[in-house]
Amino acid sequence: MPKLQFKSIPAELAPMDLLLEADPSTEQIHTYLDGSDIYTVLSDGQTVGVCVLKPHSETTLELMNIAVEPTQQGSGIGRQLLQYVISESRNKQAKELVLGTGTFGYQLAFYQREGFRVVGIDKDFFLDNYDEPVIENGIQHKDMLRLQLIL
């Protein structure tokens, strides 16, 4: 595997095609891009991953979006990007990293492997916040799990 390069970029350069891999709503993405820290991962000069962290306070950051180029999924890039972002969060003196994800799917195990724990449920989040149904593996997402990693 080629050496990966991690880079912070401004919101206007965020790769929308990749962000849409993790969040199917352009409107939702635009609600959290401004004021967020955006990190990309490059392989051979090509952007293959992206992550968006939104500060909620001096000690709490929310992982709003993390995505890897579909042809590169399963190669460990997402795990390395998440570990990089966790390290960057600690460097910023954050005390916790929080996120929301669906109640099923590979994403839940992905986060739990890195130490995130379920701390709550936002009932009907996907029904109330998305114009179109969010479907994964033929099942509609309705509720959002809230996860937390104590740094």
Show which residues each predicted segment covers:
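Acetyl-CoA-dependent GNAT
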Residues: P2-T71
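Short beta-strand-to-coil "C-cap" segments at the C-terminal boundary of structured domains/repeats
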Residues: Q148-L151
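Conserved catalytic-core motifs of GNAT/GCN5-like acyltransferases
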Residues: V98-G100, Q112, R117-G138
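Short acidic/polar active-site loop segments enriched in Thr and Asp
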Residues: T59, K95, R117
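Conserved GNAT acetyl-CoA-binding A-motif
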Residues: S89-G102
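Conserved beta-strand segments that form the floor/walls of ligand-binding pockets within enzyme
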Residues: E62, A67, G76, V98, ...
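Short hydrophobic/aromatic beta-strand or adjacent loop that forms the aromatic wall/cage
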Residues: S36-I38, H141-R146
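Conserved acetyl-CoA-binding loop-helix of GNAT-fold acetyltransferases
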Residues: G74-S87, R113
